[in-house]
Amino acid sequence: APALRLRF
């Protein structure tokens, strides 16, 4: 995945 920390 490109953005691992999107909503974390």
From Swiss-Prot:
Keyword Secreted found: yes
Keywords: Amidation, Neuropeptide, Secreted
Cellular component terms (Gene Ontology): extracellular region
GO biological process, one term: neuropeptide signaling pathway
Keyword Secreted tagged: yes
Subcellular location, record wording: Secreted
Membership in a protein family: Belongs to the FARP (FMRFamide related peptide) family.
Protein name per UniProt: FMRFamide-like neuropeptide FLP4
Organism: Macrobrachium rosenbergii (Giant fresh water prawn)
